[in-house]
């Protein structure tokens, strides 16, 4: 674990579902912020004990950049009782339109965070692009309707899930993960308002921390 700035931490852990055919590194990144009152865990996996201990006397919460980045969220909710901010998972209709599968194959939609949204485990706080979370986080649209890029004003940090990722060629918007009919330029356009913000940290969950100049290169 490394403290990037006062109240801002980064660590990595091996993703349990990783396969050698994946374009991303097995070790993925998670982040935490602590302003003395509120502790936020972003896409948490393998949370260090030092961070977990802070949850006892903080208003703690988990923030997912995408529902499929739930990682250790359920385990943390069951042990710490923290709420989870998350975008909604893919609907059955979206899966059929996007991947050309049948209604039977699509079922009830993506099973991401089903434990949270349908099984009553934990408190879900659903958000979407354009929302300002009461946790002090603003959500910007990513490469899919439920894959967000987050602005944390108190730490002057941008946290990205799959939209801005390091896949061997530097941090970038990866064409491989774009939805049907979505172009790289469209994604970049939706994120350019970030260039007007005082960004000091660009925090990728696939690729780790980067300098703010990288964001300008990617979005210009």
Model-derived segments and their meaning:
Residues 29, 80, 146:
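Residues that flank catalytic or metal-binding motifs in active/ligand-binding sites
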Residues 16-61:
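Pre-active-site segment of Zn-dependent metallo-hydrolases
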Residues 46-129:
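Active-site HxH/HxHxD metal-binding segment of metal-dependent hydrolases
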Residues 2, 6-9, 13-16, 38-41, ...:
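Metallo-beta-lactamase
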Residues 36, 58, 79, 197-198:
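Structured helix-beta-strand junction loops
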Residues 25-27, 121, 127, 144:
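Residues that act as N-cap/strand-start positions at coil-to-secondary-structure junctions
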Residues 27, 70-71, 188:
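Residue-level marker for well-ordered alpha-helical positions
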